[in-house]
């Protein structure tokens, strides 16, 4: 879902039951958002890429208010969600997914460039922090069947020369033990990076992705860890049985998690 733009901030949300984004933003508030995929966004293939780097603020004190805010956002964007969420039964069935943490990003820098043109110099270099430990690469055998499902160029996420997160679309060629990158930034030897392959159909009729974390050697990306998300070839995306089971499990575990955190039950 596209973030809301409120009070000169970008507003994102993540689940209370899967709070990794919020934890990461609290640990290091420097974040980035790349606007590059026109699907379900109102943008077109002719629009330029836009990268926003900013400082994140995490809102997780009032989960009731956060959840109501998220429900209002969903109902304003989707007729299907309006149908489901008008019913208390529908809201309670999705409670584990609807329980939200909000992350608001105060923009600090904006980079805009045309598709097919060179990257802006400010994000044209990948740095390696002193704390990053390069690990042994893993084989791509398991990923090869997945890669053919993703026709759109993947997103390469990295740290720029000042240590700020950045992300760009790149072209890739998959080899047996590495992935060749073209159209991306120059890389410091051993710079950490993450490739995200994303498949979105229509207005979230299907939403599937996986990530490959690794490091760079010149223009070669060496994978260290494969991370799947949201579906398989025959069971993917929103509306799938797999995602419905995921939401059902979140809802089942939500009361215990709220109690563990000392929070009151949600009123839906």
Positions of PLM-derived features:
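Generic recognition of flexible, low-complexity loop/linker segments
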Residues: 142-145, 155-157
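Charged, gly/pro-rich active-site loop segments
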Residues: 44-144, 184-268
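A short, compositionally biased
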Residues: 149-152, 189-191
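Surface-exposed connector loops and short turns at secondary-structure junctions
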Residues: 22-26, 188-189
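A short, hydrophobic beta-strand micro-motif
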Residues: 28-33, 192-195
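Short beta-strand segments
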Residues: 1-17, 23, 33-37, 44, ...
């Amino acid at each position: 879902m596209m973030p809301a733009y409120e009070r000169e901030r970008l507003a994102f949300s993540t689940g209370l039951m899967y709070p990794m984004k919020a934890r990461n933003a609290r640990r290091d508030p420097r974040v980035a958002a790349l606007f590059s995929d026109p699907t379900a966004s109102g943008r077109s293939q002719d629009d330029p890429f836009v990268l926003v780097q900013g400082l994140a603020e995490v809102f997780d004190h009032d989960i009731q208010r956060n959840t109501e805010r998220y429900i209002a956002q969903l109902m304003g964007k989707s007729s299907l969600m309006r149908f489901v969420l008008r019913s208390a039964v529908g809201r309670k069935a999705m409670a584990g997914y609807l329980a939200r943490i909000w992350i608001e990003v105060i923009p600090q820098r904006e980079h805009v460039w045309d598709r097919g043109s060179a990257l802006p110099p400010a994000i044209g270099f990948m740095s390696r922090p002193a704390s990053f430990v390069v690990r042994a690469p893993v084989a791509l055998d398991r990923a090869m069947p997945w890669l053919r499902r993703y026709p759109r160029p993947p997103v390469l996420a990295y740290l720029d020369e000042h240590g700020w997160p950045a992300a760009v679309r790149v072209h890739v060629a998959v080899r047996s033990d590495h992935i060749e990158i073209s159209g991306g930034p120059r890389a410091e030897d051993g710079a950490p990076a993450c490739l995200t392959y994303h498949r979105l159909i229509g207005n979230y009729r299907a939403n599937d992705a996986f990530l490959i974390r690794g490091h760079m050697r010149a223009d070669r990306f060496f994978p260290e860890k494969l991370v799947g998300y949201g579906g398989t070839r025959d069971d993917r995306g929103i509306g799938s049985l797999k995602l419905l089971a995921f939401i059902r499990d979140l809802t089942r575990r939500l009361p215990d998690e709220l109690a563990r955190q000392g929070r009151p039950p949600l009123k839906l």
